[in-house]
């Protein structure tokens, strides 16, 4: 197994020292993730690319998944590496691999060469291309826009034949930019805005203002852990939860109805600014888009920004909602957002779209700011890697089983795409598929006389969902970890 990783082109327009630093960070990020999930996989920095190799193909799919979801990578080449004797030997090896690919098609050979050889790259292309054209009668050479491009790389005495090219995330390696604090609600917008900053190279910490109790917090932890695990697991980041119900209660009691929405957002920013300062985080990230709701007019956003000196970043400010949802679907957060409760929009019946500074300040003068200081002081912070451990500790009564007991039903709670890619089939066992985001509404319709074993690939989602179901009063659930 061998992959050639090409860093994002923006890295190579940097100065030599910055380029070296960025590629070194990318190398370390890849190595850290690969070592945490696989064995016997080596990572090498080759200046203009990074090689990931193993003697075995056991972790092929796992490594490819890691590389295509790691920030800073433009594309990944999947290659077959072998030794060669001479130019004709190269041709014979390429013919063996490429014959079925070019039959009844047009093709071109593109070659790259490093090291000392008795042939040039152009001579290599002509020799191999001419040989393929003669050996495969139904194939035809076409230099521009062919059906198939046969890619060959020669480095020293090694021949690399490109089997496939996979698109990377792009952006910058994680950790090359300064840290940010994402105000995450679990909805479409905050998940996408967090992803965009991960992709751009920032370590994204998560701050959740809890307005909806334990069930809401569990859901937000799930999407935060998913984003970290899928795109940023090379970094150590924090998840911070702030119980904002006392603040909301004070606003509902003291503040004029029309000003509630903007003042709540101002309280969010004040609290987040204090947390960012405590942890030396340079900027806040929100999922706000211009005009999407009443608090997101330019006037209101300016009043919201003015309560903190911390930089506020809004990567979605000019995005349409449809585009946000499409990207959420692409990165895998759509299913979380679909069932995430939304609380912020319900506290003001007639919200202002053009707040006045003096009126906001007059309403806030009624507010007891010691409540805000108290909830920030009592905020709970944890290493995001401990979310899975917390789910175990928070629900020790959730039993894990390795074998399916008699009459039990296995519930595959993975997303439809994951289930399609690797269906769960167990001989003699009733396996049902209910995606995790539908469990809350569909589990109660199942036969409650039976025991249900929740299954996901890593066991994190199944434990969190089991905790959620038990909070709803269902005690017939266990976690299936074969």
From Swiss-Prot:
> SUPFAM superfamilies from the entry?
Adenine nucleotide alpha hydrolases-like, Rhodanese/Cell cycle control phosphatase, THUMP domain-like
Q: Does the keyword RNA-binding apply?
A: yes
User: Per the record, what are the reactions this protein catalyses?
Assistant: [ThiI sulfur-carrier protein]-S-sulfanyl-L-cysteine + a uridine in tRNA + 2 reduced [2Fe-2S]-[ferredoxin] + ATP + H(+) = [ThiI sulfur-carrier protein]-L-cysteine + a 4-thiouridine in tRNA + 2 oxidized [2Fe-2S]-[ferredoxin] + AMP + diphosphate; [ThiS sulfur-carrier protein]-C-terminal Gly-Gly-AMP + S-sulfanyl-L-cysteinyl-[cysteine desulfurase] + AH2 = [ThiS sulfur-carrier protein]-C-terminal-Gly-aminoethanethioate + L-cysteinyl-[cysteine desulfurase] + A + AMP + 2 H(+)
UniProt xrefs under CDD domains = PPase_ThiI, RHOD, THUMP_ThiI
Give the location in the cell. Answer: Cytoplasm
**Residues holding ATP:** 183-184, 265, 287, 296
Q: Which InterPro entries match?
A: Rhodanese-like_dom, Rhodanese-like_dom_sf, Rossmann-like_a/b/a_fold, ThiI_AANH, ThiI_fer, ThiI_N, THII_Thiazole_biosynth_dom, THUMP_dom
Catalytic residues identified in the record? 456
GO BP term (any one)? thiazole biosynthetic process
Main localization of the protein? cytoplasm
Any GO MF annotation of the entry? tRNA binding
Database matches in Pfam families = ThiI, ThiI_fer, THUMP
Q: Cite the THUMP domain residue spans from the record.
A: 61-165
Keyword field: ATP-binding, Cytoplasm, Disulfide bond, Nucleotide-binding, Redox-active center, RNA-binding, Thiamine biosynthesis, Transferase, tRNA-binding
Q: Which pathway?
A: Cofactor biosynthesis; thiamine diphosphate biosynthesis
Q: One GO cellular component term, please give it.
A: cytosol
- Which cysteine pairs are covalently linked by disulfides here? 344-456
- In this protein, which residues make up the domain named Rhodanese? 404-482
Q: What is its EC number?
A: 2.8.1.4
* Family membership noted in the UniProt record: Belongs to the ThiI family.
- Function of the molecule: Catalyzes the ATP-dependent transfer of a sulfur to tRNA to produce 4-thiouridine in position 8 of tRNAs, which functions as a near-UV photosensor. Also catalyzes the transfer of sulfur to the sulfur carrier protein ThiS, forming ThiS-thiocarboxylate. This is a step in the synthesis of thiazole, in the thiamine biosynthesis pathway. The sulfur is donated as persulfide by IscS.
**HAMAP family documented for this protein:** ThiI (MF_00021)
Q: What is this protein called?
A: tRNA sulfurtransferase
Gene (UniProt): thiI
